[in-house]
UniProtKB/Swiss-Prot annotation:
<keyword id="KW-0949">S-adenosyl-L-methionine</keyword>
<feature type="binding site">
    <location>
        <begin position="128"/>
        <end position="129"/>
    </location>
    <ligand>
        <name>S-adenosyl-L-methionine</name>
    </ligand>
</feature>
<comment type="similarity">
    <text>Belongs to the methyltransferase superfamily. RNA methyltransferase RsmG family.</text>
</comment>
<keyword id="KW-0489">Methyltransferase</keyword>
<dbReference type="GO" id="GO:0070043">
    <property type="term" value="F:rRNA (guanine-N7-)-methyltransferase activity"/>
</dbReference>
<dbReference type="Pfam" id="PF02527">
    <property type="entry name" value="GidB"/>
</dbReference>
<feature type="binding site">
    <location>
        <position position="77"/>
    </location>
    <ligand>
        <name>S-adenosyl-L-methionine</name>
    </ligand>
</feature>
<keyword id="KW-0698">rRNA processing</keyword>
<dbReference type="InterPro" id="IPR029063">
    <property type="entry name" value="SAM-dependent_MTases_sf"/>
</dbReference>
<dbReference type="GO" id="GO:0005829">
    <property type="term" value="C:cytosol"/>
</dbReference>
<keyword id="KW-0808">Transferase</keyword>
<dbReference type="InterPro" id="IPR003682">
    <property type="entry name" value="rRNA_ssu_MeTfrase_G"/>
</dbReference>
<comment type="function">
    <text>Specifically methylates the N7 position of guanine in position 535 of 16S rRNA.</text>
</comment>
<protein>
    <recommendedName>
        <fullName>Ribosomal RNA small subunit methyltransferase G</fullName>
        <ecNumber>2.1.1.-</ecNumber>
    </recommendedName>
</protein>
<feature type="binding site">
    <location>
        <position position="147"/>
    </location>
    <ligand>
        <name>S-adenosyl-L-methionine</name>
    </ligand>
</feature>
<keyword id="KW-0963">Cytoplasm</keyword>
<feature type="region of interest" description="Disordered">
    <location>
        <begin position="219"/>
        <end position="238"/>
    </location>
</feature>
Amino acid sequence: MEATQFQAMLEERGISLSSQALAQFERYYELLVEWNEKMNLTAITDKPGVYVKHFFDSVSPAFYYDFSEPFSLCDVGAGAGFPSIPLKICFPHLRVSIVDSLQKRIRFLQHLVGELGLKDIALYHDRAETFARQKGMRESFDVVTARAVARMPVLAELCLPLTKVGGTFLAMKAASAPEELKEGEKAIAVLGGEVTATETFMLPFEEGERTIIFVQKTKKTPARYPRKPGTPNKQPIQ
């Protein structure tokens, strides 16, 4: 896949990429492959695969949600920067915070952000469970994203405490989303959220089905959540 083809696919979805943004995606791909030789960032390294399964997929929330306003976005468990860095490239006015529990991934992201010349990005080496208890972080973000990092009850406990009341939690899932949504219903309600929409689409070239679950934060999360690191995964709210 050429970058211009990627540009055209996003254009069809109403997202226009500048020449600078295109160049940033190209450099992102180069750095991802280069650093992947030193550390495990992604199993997908071929150019078409990265552009479709990482870049296009990461930008997909903007097909259904208005990213034109300058709001704060927190990406939980971003790994190699997905979905927040592609979203930031497309929408430079976003104020982005990235939380990841692995220091080596944060090192990659620091290098990436510098190389791409991205501003207004904060990187945190932390677990979501403890990050949400830091002063100034809890219930402070307009949008919180997570891309396939855990099952829905677990994701909700990691992300909704960071989402401000009136804000939105976007859970980006693969094809198993309907079962996960059912499994996560109780946790979402307990944590102060309400599912407002689910959007399902196919990646280009039939590279798989994706679903985005939109959860609005309607009331404050009870103070006991999130629980200690590891507990949400071992004993999910059900």
